C-alpha cells in the first residue's frame, strides 16, 4: 500500500510540475501587438514573416468642411492616394517603395524592429526604427524654390536640381501590448527637406503617439496623434505662421488573417510622414 501511495504522490507531483512549466511565460515575442504594420498615419513595430511581399493601398478623401454638399469629403477636391510594395528579406527587417498622388512623391523606406516585446517581459517594449526618403516629382513651375534673390522674399522661378526634390523622415518608435485588447506606442521623429519655400523651415522635430483598443476578435478602435514640435533654436523663421498643425486621427480597424482594413477620419491630407510634419 505504501508503494502505491508513494507512486501516486510522485505521479501527482510530476503532472503538477509539467502544468506549471507550461503556464510559465516564454521569452517568445508577444502575439499581434498591432494587427498591421500601419496605424492610420503611423508605422508600428509589426513586420510580416520573412520573404513576405505586402501590397499597401492608402487613400484619403478631401476635406469635410463643406459638410453634406460634398458628402463629407467624398466629392470634395484634394483626395490623396498612395500605392506601395513592402518586402521582408529577413525577420524584423522590411524594405519598401511607393508612389503618392500629392506632390507626385516617389519614396523608398525601411523599417527595423530592433527589439520585440516578449511574453515573459524580459523585453517589456518593442523598439522600432523607420526611415523614408522621397522625391517630389512635380514640374519645376510648381515649386517655391526658397532661393531668395531679394530681401523681400522673392524666389527664383525655376532652377530646381534633383537633390532639391529630396526629403527625409526618420523615426524611433517604442510600443507595448499591455493586454490582449490594448496596445500603445509613442515615438519621436526628424524631418528634413532639402528645399522648401522661403517662409518654411528645412527641419522639423515631431512627437507621436498612437494606440489600439480591441473590442472583438477582428475589430478595434484605433487612433494616432502627430505633433510637430516648435524648437526656436533650429527654426529659420521669426514666427510660426507656416508651421504644420498637429494631426489627430481616429477610426475603426477590421482585421482578418491576411488583411487589415482601416476606416478613419483625420486632420492631415498628407500620407507620407515628412509631408504631414512639414505641411
Residue ranges: model-predicted function:
Residues 186-230:
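A mid-sequence, solvent-exposed acidic-amphipathic segment
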Residues 1-31:
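Cleavable N-terminal export/targeting peptides
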Residues 21-160, 166-170, 178, 182, ...:
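Transmembrane beta-barrel domains of Gram-negative outer membranes and organellar outer membranes
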Residues 12, 18-19, 142-143, 184, ...:
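Compositionally biased regions
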